[in-house]
Amino acid sequence: MYLNNSKTIVIKIGSSLLINDRKIVRKKWLSEFSKDIKELLDNKKNVIIVSSGAIALGCKKLNLNKKSLKLDKSQAVASIGQIELMNLYKKTFNSKKINLSQILLTLEDTEKRRRAINAKRTFDNLFKLRFVPIVNENDSIATTEIKYGDNDRLASRVAQISGADCLILLSDVDGLYTQNPKIYHDAK
């Protein structure tokens, strides 16, 4: 019902929804998700997907453990994984005739007014062309000091910049917490 009243919808996908702990890509889940996106587009909705998964898919390709990566290596792995991520989306969404684009953002891109306005213009033009932007943090150049750290925050900022009516966060976390419950056991 709420989606019926929304014109622009931002959907954030956590990497665990795309690839499981055993590094197996969840193709069936992504295929079902693409059907939902197609339905939204058929109903004249503008959709932005904020997707995690570049580092996880890079680790899969290189057979690495994500937890052992230092920043410089994780930046390289993200660069490798970003192509894998976009290929995964392209293969899945092409069968539904959904046009995709890619936007990689840093914290500065969303916090500096001129850059945020440019991002807004890009989103608006992609909507006019009936493309679905897939947004991710530009992990290959982001450093600890200028990094979002998780795509929930990035998705929130993308929703603000794009003027979205609705933000949907899809993850394997049960509910909304004050902190990451996997790291902070006192999270509420």
Predicted regions and their residues:
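Nucleotide/pyrophosphate-binding catalytic subdomain
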Residues: 1-188
